[in-house]
Amino acid sequence: MKFFGVPALMLAGACSTNSGSLAPSPQSHVAAPRAVSHDRRWGPNVSAACPDRRPDEAQCFLLIRTGPQLVPDGGSGPNGGFTPAQLQKAYNLPSATRGSGQIIAIVDAYDNPRLADDLAYYRSYFGMPAANFTKYNQLGQLGAYPVGNEQWGAEEDLDVQMASASCQNCSIVLIEANSPSAKDLGNAVKAAAALGAHIISNSYGCYTACGLKEKYFEARGVTYLAASGDDGYGTGVGTPGAFAAVVDVGGTTLVAGVKGKRGFEESAWPGTNSGCSHKSKPSWQHDPGCAFRTANDIAAIADPNTGPAFYDTYGFSGWLVGGGTSASTPLIAGAFGLAGNASSQNGGRTFWEKAHEGPNDLYRITRGKNGTCKPAYLCQEGTQEYRDYGGPAGWGTPNGIGAF
């Protein structure tokens, strides 16, 4: 089988878990058009999972490596992808001992009827316990799921697996919107909060006025996270990431096999969005080069060339290597789950106010850029134009859970 130009991959085993979902009929399954790489920042062997969106819809940000691994120091998992153990080590996450009782909600569009089985296989393959996982429709109900869509289905697989990778003991709920429209996604976000999730991860967005409403991202006691996007500097800062109550998550290139205590190094990933948004400047941001909401707040692995391994049997044939800020966002959501303080946090404000309290709680990113800009700190790391801040990676990447 081939899809999006990705060769069929030999499966390492078979799933036997009951998904607990209502599989759509063949008539309700949507295989959207083939997506192709259109951004040189991604590299020659990377494709976008979701096609370009309609003006009134959000777009998922999953990127998939479609060719051989070009970077020798990637992960040790299938196809050279990073494993959960490597990600936990890279970010110093106490994943085995914390997170019980925490709920991470993932919001996406459309259905993936294979998702529970894919998640079960991913966790079993990497030696994690069975997941506490539940899938809901956009009204927060079991059953009556939307039509299936292979592209968004792959996004859903990556999201729940990355949340598992960083917080294996967290409960994970997936809320499937009927479509990527602003209204449907907003209702799904609202349902996630009503279900009791204090952490809501959103790996989608739009750079123009698609109609996403800020009111859906303002529930008390909820930490919202959003992917910043994968088009580099200059395409804008989209929503929902630009909303003041949302943690805007950027991306890095993570490399393994480095000498030193950590064993990894990171630089800004050229594909991550960052910069000066069109939303009002929050009172807790004081950087001098942007009169509006500045992005990003924090970051994690996003470069699909050295991305995490994930598993999809709905539109693909098993193991893939993915990336984009779709990978970093649920991974950071898991870090909030490990810390257990999400109900008392306040979006991106957390990192802007705490960035100087515990300098060892975040790995400062000092290299890399995602474009050319003035002032340079909005698109480049290590400038020291505004303290340790750089737009692509925000205040840094997790070093444990002290910053959360």
Feature-to-residue mapping (PLM):
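C-terminal motif of bacterial Sec signal peptides marking the signal peptidase cleavage site
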Residues: 13-14
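Polar, glycine-rich mid-to-C-terminal structural blocks
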Residues: 248-276
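Substrate-binding/charge-relay-adjacent region of secreted/lumenal peptidase catalytic domains
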Residues: 25-251, 274-324, 329, 340-349, ...
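Short, surface-exposed amphipathic charged segments that create phosphate/polyanion-binding patches used
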Residues: 148-153, 189-190, 261-267, 380, ...
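A residue-level detector for conformationally permissive "hinge/kink" positions
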Residues: 5, 221, 316, 326, ...
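An often Trp-containing, charged/polar helix-loop segment at the C-terminal end
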Residues: 18-21, 333, 340-391, 399
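Residue-level signal for mature regions of secreted extracellular proteins and peptides
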Residues: 8, 43, 53-54, 365-366, ...
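Sec-dependent signal peptide recognition
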Residues: 1-8
